[in-house]
């Protein structure tokens, strides 16, 4: 049985009805032995949960492919690794293997194509790295399921006054690394292309990274990442505190919107971002480019 999104989500459901696959799109009202989906044209559809073949959460408003491409461009500049190379519309990033974002190629131009993968594979081979592709929905027609399924969530930014309890620094110090469970070098964490980066810390308790970069359409985006809370300090509002501090910092630097990238199975992080006003924009997944060279698309 598939994993169901929370009630209230807008979803696309494929299910079995009289031995054939049927699709429905609408808002998920209830989850249980039966799920209920409110549609625009057919009212509320009740479906036995066991008959659901696949269910996918959708953004609440229509998102154009160009909007996805613009956001992904800003996000790639915000996590560029320590080395970058453009190849026929693909931005290749390398950062010593630390983090998927800093060590993957992302298609950022209309010209990006699967036919161009062999040079990408070779570029990563020369650096002794696996040739991962970060593939956002709708930018490339690829059938591979991939791994690390990720949702990209967004919200508009404003300068709503809040009490800031986090300290902001331009580098990740020992206090920031408290509770950060990854050994990512400073040169990878601080890397940004044509933008600014900052690190928010509630000393000894929590931290997060923020970066402001600009998309090709001129939109300045704040990317929030590496949000972490030290063990023993969960559910006390510290994650919210560092995120709110970063949102104010980003707004002060001209960012109009903010985004986060979060793994689909990280329910706690998704709940935090939803509480902060973030909603689904699109999905992405990681695919080993070598697997696409060996199979037909």
Features from the language model and the residues they span:
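Conserved beta-strand-loop-alpha-helix junction that forms the acyl-donor binding cleft
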Residues: 133-139, 231, 260-270, 286-293
